[in-house]
Amino acid sequence: MSTWANLGLQDSASPLMEQLIFFHDHALLILVMITVLVGYLMFMLFFNSYVNRFLLHGQLIEMIWTILPAIILLFIAMPSLRLLYLLDEINEPSITLKSIGHQWYWSYEYSDFNNVEFDSYMIPTNELSNDGFRLLDVDNRIVLPMNSQIRILVTAADVIHSWTVPALGVKVDGTPGRLNQTNFFINRPGLFYGQCSEICGANHSFMPIVIESVPVNYFIKWISSTVNS
């Protein structure tokens, strides 16, 4: 989750988020190089004393400023396209989770198991425990197994919502009447926080998401106890 004075992205908890961070750093490096080059050229133009009133055209410089940006765009586009295909790929999921957005809470269904569904509301500030996070903790967490391919189906019951967990690199719009899907792979245990990322009304800020990532054997015990209860 985001912490005070956090300048970078959140620590990744999935391979896809690691790739997104690498691409961010790659694109930022290119932007810094362009900024330095343009700044150097502007500095030289402002402070040199050379004047050439007879320079009307220059084929070489025109070729350079046409070809160089095209090459730079290729260096940005190729890894970007690769990432787009990776984000859309569904790899034989071990478990499917369905998330339904409401004004203003989430409801979840574990499609592979019978009778495993629940609503997830934000815990009000006056009911938080001492170690809780304001506006981020919920009464019912999503429990998912680590080191497993997970497919999530997202929709909405009323208006457009967006199911987002930054540490996993996941952001899926929930649209009434449509079913969007993506997959992710959690590579470490822990709690991962997210929020609705689409303005959906007065209490849009109060729709947190909490994923509890646990080893597979703990997940099986949790599912068994939930089904039996």
UniProtKB/Swiss-Prot annotation:
GO terms classed as biological process: ATP synthesis coupled electron transport
EC class: translocase
UniProt keywords, alphabetically: Copper, Electron transport, Magnesium, Membrane, Metal-binding, Mitochondrion, Mitochondrion inner membrane, Respiratory chain, Translocase, Transmembrane, Transmembrane helix, Transport
Listed Pfam families: COX2, COX2_TM
Membrane topology summary: Multi-pass membrane protein
InterPro entries assigned to the protein according to its UniProt record, in alphabetical order: CcO_II, CcO_II-like_C, CcO_II_C, Copper_CuA, Cupredoxin, Cyt_c_oxidase_su2, Cyt_c_oxidase_su2_TM_dom, Cyt_c_oxidase_su2_TM_sf
GO MF term list: copper ion binding; cytochrome-c oxidase activity
NCBIfam families, per database record: CoxB
Role this protein plays: Component of the cytochrome c oxidase, the last enzyme in the mitochondrial electron transport chain which drives oxidative phosphorylation. The respiratory chain contains 3 multisubunit complexes succinate dehydrogenase (complex II, CII), ubiquinol-cytochrome c oxidoreductase (cytochrome b-c1 complex, complex III, CIII) and cytochrome c oxidase (complex IV, CIV), that cooperate to transfer electrons derived from NADH and succinate to molecular oxygen, creating an electrochemical gradient over the inner membrane that drives transmembrane transport and the ATP synthase.
Annotated protein name in UniProt: Cytochrome c oxidase subunit 2
Organism: Drosophila lowei
Native organism taxonomy: Eukaryota, Metazoa, Ecdysozoa, Arthropoda, Hexapoda
